[in-house]
């Protein structure tokens, strides 16, 4: 990573919930320790529903300025739960860009580890049906937790994992693997990771 860059204004990241908020805080710690003059200001929206995120944007008086983004799980938009996908399609042009995690934060977490781990998770997701159609949290979270236990030597997570946790401290290796595992048409995929990589280049 190139630390020779000018100090920049903070990026405002509207996080759909506790997990994303915790991640951005950990990312800031990592960047600060690396001496990189990049800051992400996180705001916790308390839920990833489109109406909720739209209201947060209105409250914060956000605009499309190249420095404000919304980080959200894609699962409820893909399933169109409560019309979220439909509303997003109609109104997205009037809001800051959405950076989707495919499908959810837990998928995103595993992108920070080896290709062997990511490949094993893809196989698990294919068996459960999560690969093609995102499962609801009540269905995928036990699968994810069991996967983490089976792969604890490779993951070195804090156990037991609960939603809202940032279960490991970011390192150079984690960030490099996140970028390496973030192929455009693969699963998992993170548009937030794409933004981070672009900023750090």
Stretches found by the model and what they are:
Residues 1-8, 21, 25-42, 54-69, ...:
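C-terminal accessory helical subdomains adjacent to catalytic cores in phosphodiester-
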Residues 44-47:
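Conserved helicase motor
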Residues 49-53:
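Conserved helicase/translocase motor-coupling segment
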């Amino acid at each position: 990573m190139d630390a020779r860059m000018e100090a920049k204004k903070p990026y405002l990241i509207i996080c759909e919930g506790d997990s994303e908020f915790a991640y951005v805080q950990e990312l800031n710690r990592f960047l600060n320790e690396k001496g990189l003059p990049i800051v992400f200001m996180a705001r916790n929206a308390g839920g990833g529903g489109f109406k909720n995120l739209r209201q947060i944007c209105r409250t914060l008086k956000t605009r499309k300025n190249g420095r404000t983004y919304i980080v959200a799980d894609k699962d409820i938009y893909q399933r169109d739960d409560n019309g979220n996908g439909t509303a997003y399609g109609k109104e997205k042009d009037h809001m800051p860009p959405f950076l989707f995690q495919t499908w959810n934060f837990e998928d995103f977490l595993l992108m920070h580890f080896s290709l062997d781990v990511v490949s094993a998770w893809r196989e698990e997701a294919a068996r459960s049906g999560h690969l093609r159609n995102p499962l609801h949290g009540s269905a995928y979270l036990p699968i994810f937790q069991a996967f983490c236990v089976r792969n604890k030597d490779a993951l070195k997570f804090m156990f037991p994992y609960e939603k809202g946790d940032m279960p490991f401290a970011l390192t150079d290796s984690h960030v490099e693997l996140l970028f390496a595992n973030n192929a455009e048409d693969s699963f998992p995929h993170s548009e937030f990771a794409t933004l981070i990589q672009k900023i750090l280049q």
